[in-house]
């Protein structure tokens, strides 16, 4: 963050990147895949596919993933989403059982893994960075509640933009790929919880957080 210059410039750049990411996700809430709503457990009749890499999912190539299933009757259920930390003991996707299993390696190649998270397909990371800026401003070494209040306002603007661009109708471009949509509770927790925690002793911060949540 320090490489971006002044705090005001940093927050403005992060906010703009976040808005672009959230608008893109609002228009493709499941990255173009079929909504996977019951995602708390492994679907029946599927096998788990585990990664060989350790790191954060930076990007999922949905076009390439869908093409791999063009002439294949099976379906893919994405467990990992952009921003997920993965390792070889954690399944990144479930695959409908079939005769040929060699496709698993090709499927894994569509999931780009990096050492760090990226804004590209990861709206939650955008909120986490915004919250981090606010928390740094609230640290005893900085003690700048004004910046934290400014960031809270920006966070509310990001979430409002996301809500305004969401559509009740989801366009499914890749019906063989099932993706869980973002959960509103997760978004609120990503942004507001750290700020509320670090600003617990400041009345003005708590008021802003409560107003933002309302």
Question: Where in the sequence are the language-model features?
Answer:
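Short basic (Lys/Arg) and small-residue
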Residues: 2-77, 81, 90-94, 102-214
């Amino acid at each position: 963050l320090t490489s971006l210059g002044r705090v005001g410039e940093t927050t403005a750049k992060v906010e703009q990147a976040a808005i672009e990411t959230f608008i893109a996700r609002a228009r493709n809430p499941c990255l173009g895949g079929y909504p996977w709503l019951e995602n708390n457990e492994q679907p029946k009749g599927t096998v788990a596919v585990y990664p060989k890499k350790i790191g954060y999912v930076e990007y999922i190539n949905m076009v390439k993933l869908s093409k791999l299933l063009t002439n294949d009757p099976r379906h893919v259920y994405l467990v990992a989403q952009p921003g997920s930390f993965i390792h070889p003991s954690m399944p990144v996707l479930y695959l409908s059982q079939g005769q040929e299993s060699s496709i698993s390696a090709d499927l894994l190649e569509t999931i780009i893994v990096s050492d760090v998270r990226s804004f590209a397909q990861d709206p939650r990371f955008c909120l986490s960075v915004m919250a981090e800026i606010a928390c740094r401003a609230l640290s005893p070494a900085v003690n700048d509640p004004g910046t934290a209040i400014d960031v809270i306002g920006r966070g509310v603007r990001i979430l409002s933009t996301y809500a305004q661009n969401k559509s009740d109708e989801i366009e499914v471009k890749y019906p063989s790929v099932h993706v869980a949509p973002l959960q509103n509770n997760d978004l609120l927790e990503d942004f507001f919880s750290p700020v509320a925690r670090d600003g617990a002793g400041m009345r003005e911060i708590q008021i802003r957080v409560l107003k933002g949540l309302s």
